[in-house]
Each structure stands twice: as structure tokens, then as C-alpha cells.
């Protein structure tokens, strides 16, 4: 277990080709974010004497909900928290939430943020930090914001995704970004192909390559870092964002 915060731990489980399941642990209870598959989650929880408190679902894609049913079969008292607007596609949810709803999970305040774009009903979960407890804010953002990138627009429009990223960009700059895929290196290589002289992109790319060579993930990042190196966050208007998204969709590394 690693990635310790004050009073809790956030642990990554890399699965499939590039998915990351995040396990948030406090006092022997676990919150699982977007479990693509169940087996490694069950093994980690049982191997560490943990019980499943709840599952947070950002959206309905199979590589985010594929392991949930088996997890609640093993821990039937666990809650599944998902967007009320996605009830027809995440039918096993037991707690349906809406935009700006505030939750209290294991003593931590969580705010639900609607971020349509990748899918029409995508949500993020924002853990509000505090100076008193020395906890940085945390955002579990699924496939909306990636390291140096953003999700493809399978259901939403460029306008929706631009507005969703703008909402995220209004969060505190020290917010830690816990996305659901390890795409950072490829995203930075794409960004460098557009801005080959950008020192921030170049430095982050070198750092990511070094981290990966040592067996570490490139995420979480901080929002302050995304503001410097993520072209989608840097986009000044919807038109610029749409052009970048189209360019990225057609880019071959």
C-alpha cells in the first residue's frame, strides 16, 4: 500500500492494458474507484484484511464497471455510488448522486461534479482537502482529464468537454489528479509535436519517461502541472479545444 495522505492511503492497481483502479483506504475500510475487473481488488483487500465500504463509478464504460458486480457479491453491504442520470446504464448503483451533491464517506467530504463530454453522464468525485489536516484536495476524474490529455468525445460535444475541463480547472491548483488511464507519455509526445520548444512539456516528458523506467506511474499529477503542460486545459476557448481534440484523435505517434 502506498500514496499515503493524512489518515488514509490511496493505492493504484494497474490492470488491463492501461487502466488504473484506485483504492482509497482508511481504518481498514476501502473505497474502490472504477473497478475494471474484480480479482486484483479482491486479492488486495483480503490480503490486507480490508473490507469494501463503497465503489465510486465515474461513468458506465465496461472498463470502469466490469468488476463491480463481483465485488458487491463478495461484500454485499458495500454501496455503489454513481450518477442518477446513469441509472439505466449502471443499474447496480445503490446511491444515486447529482451535480454538486456533497457526500460524507469515512469522515471525508466528497463533492460530486458533473463533467459531460467523454460520456453524457460522466461525473468526478472531489475530495476537499484542508490546511488544518494537511490533506491536499483529490479529484477522481475517470476519463475526463488525463495526464497531459483528456478523454475522447464518445457521447458529448466539444463545448461540453471544454466546459467540464473549465470546471476542473477552477479547483485549487494543488488538487491531485487521479485519472483512470496511464496515457501521460503519449499525450506529452503529442503535445511536443505541436509545441517542440515548450520547456514545460519537454521537462515533464523527461520526468515521465524516467518514472516509468523505474516502474512508477506518472500519476497522480497536480492541477498546477496540468495547467502548464495539458494543451486541453490550456485551450482558451471552445474552438481551440475542438481543433486540438480533432488533431489528437487523428494523431499517429
Curated annotation (Swiss-Prot):
What Pfam families does the record tag this protein with? HAGH_C, Lactamase_B
A GO MF annotation of the entry reads: metal ion binding
NCBIfam families the record matches: GSH_gloB
Which family would the database say this protein is a member of? Belongs to the metallo-beta-lactamase superfamily. Glyoxalase II family.
The record ties this protein, via InterPro entries, to: Clx_II_MBL (IPR035680), Glyoxalase_II_hydrolase (IPR050110), HAGH_C (IPR032282), Hydroxyacylglutathione_Hdrlase (IPR017782), Metallo-B-lactamas (IPR001279), RibonucZ/Hydroxyglut_hydro (IPR036866)
> What is the name listed in the Swiss-Prot or TrEMBL entry for this protein?
Hydroxyacylglutathione hydrolase
User: Per UniProt, where does Zn(2+) 2 bind?
Assistant: 63-64, 143, 181
What task does this protein carry out?
Answer: Thiolesterase that catalyzes the hydrolysis of S-D-lactoyl-glutathione to form glutathione and D-lactic acid.
Its cofactor is: Zn(2+)
Organism of origin is Prochlorococcus marinus (strain SARG / CCMP1375 / SS120)
Bound cofactor: record note: Binds 2 Zn(2+) ions per subunit.
Amino acid at each position: 500500500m502506498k500514496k499515503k495522505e493524512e489518515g488514509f492511503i490511496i493505492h493504484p492497481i494497474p490492470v488491463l492494458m492501461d487502466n488504473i483502479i484506485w483504492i482509497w483506504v482508511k481504518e481498514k475500510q476501502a473505497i474502490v474507484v472504477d473497478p475494471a475487473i474484480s480479482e486484483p481488488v479482491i486479492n488486495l483487500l483480503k490480503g490486507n484484511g480490508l473490507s469494501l465500504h463503497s465503489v465510486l463509478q465515474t461513468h458506465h464504460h465496461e472498463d470502469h464497471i466490469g468488476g463491480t458486480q463481483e465485488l458487491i457479491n463478495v461484500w454485499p453491504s458495500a454501496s455503489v455510488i454513481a450518477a442518477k442520470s446513469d441509472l439505466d446504464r449502471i443499474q447496480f448503483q445503490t446511491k444515486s448522486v447529482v451535480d454538486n451533491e456533497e457526500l460524507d464517506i469515512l469522515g471525508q467530504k466528497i463533492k460530486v461534479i458533473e463533467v459531460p463530454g467523454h460520456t453524457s453522464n460522466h461525473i468526478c468525485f472531489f475530495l476537499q482537502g484542508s490546511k488544518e489536516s494537511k490533506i491536499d484536495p483529490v479529484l477522481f476524474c475517470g476519463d475526463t482529464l488525463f495526464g497531459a490529455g483528456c478523454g475522447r468525445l464518445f457521447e458529448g460535444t466539444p463545448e461540453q468537454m471544454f466546459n467540464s475541463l473549465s470546471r476542473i480547472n477552477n479547483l485549487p491548483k494543488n488538487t491531485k489528479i487521479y485519472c483512470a488511464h496511464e496515457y501521460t507519455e503519449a499525450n506529452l509526445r503529442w503535445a511536443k509535436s505541436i509545441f517542440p520548444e515548450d520547456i514545460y512539456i519537454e521537462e515533464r516528458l523527461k520526468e515521465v519517461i524516467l518514472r516509468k523506467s523505474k516502474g512508477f506511474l506518472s500519476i497522480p499529477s497536480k492541477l498546477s502541472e496540468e495547467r502548464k503542460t495539458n494543451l486541453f486545459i490550456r485551450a482558451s476557448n471552445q474552438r481551440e479545444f475542438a481543433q486540438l481534440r480533432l488533431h489528437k484523435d487523428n494523431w499517429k505517434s
